[in-house]
Design a protein with these regions (language model features):
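Alpha-helical polar/charged "hotspots" used for coordination or helix-helix interfaces
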Residues: 5, 19-20, 40, 98
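Conserved aromatic-histidine-acidic binding/catalytic patches
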Residues: 1, 25, 83
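Amphipathic alpha-helical binding modules
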Residues: 72-110
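Hydrophobic membrane-targeting and insertion signals
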Residues: 1-19, 109
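Amphipathic alpha-helical interaction modules
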Residues: 21-68
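An amphipathic alpha-helix signature
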Residues: 6-14, 30, 34, 38, ...
Length: 110
């Protein structure tokens, strides 16, 4: 994505998740982050926010609720009922962090 720090994103997101209360081991946390980032990017491509190469197309096509639902759908595959509260907490922190970052770098404006 234009201007998006792909290499720095996992560490930035991990800090947000830890502040929100995520306590799992680093490898599990980063696996969650990788899956969430991939699902978020998939949503943005499907919504017309990004093109296939990752270039930013149209920020007006971004819908935060739809993005959250798409990421949740990808993350909850295979998750058991007991894992859902922690998953939802991490999803909320992930989306807050991502949207704030996209606004900060000027890709989104609400």
């Amino acid at each position: 994505m234009d201007g998006y720090d792909v290499k720095g994103a996992p560490a930035r997101i991990a800090k947000a998740l830890r502040r929100a209360g995520a306590r799992e081991p680093e490898d599990e946390l980063y696996a969650f982050i990788d899956r969430a980032m991939a699902a978020h990017e998939d949503y943005m491509r499907a919504a017309g926010v990004l093109d296939e190469s990752g270039a930013w197309l149209d920020a007006d096509m971004y819908d935060e609720d739809d993005a959250c639902e798409a990421v949740l759908a990808a993350l909850e595959e295979g998750a058991d009922e007991e894992a859902m509260p922690a998953l939802l907490m991490k999803l909320d922190a992930f989306m807050e962090c991502e949207v704030a970052y996209l606004e900060e770098i000027g890709l989104l404006a609400f």
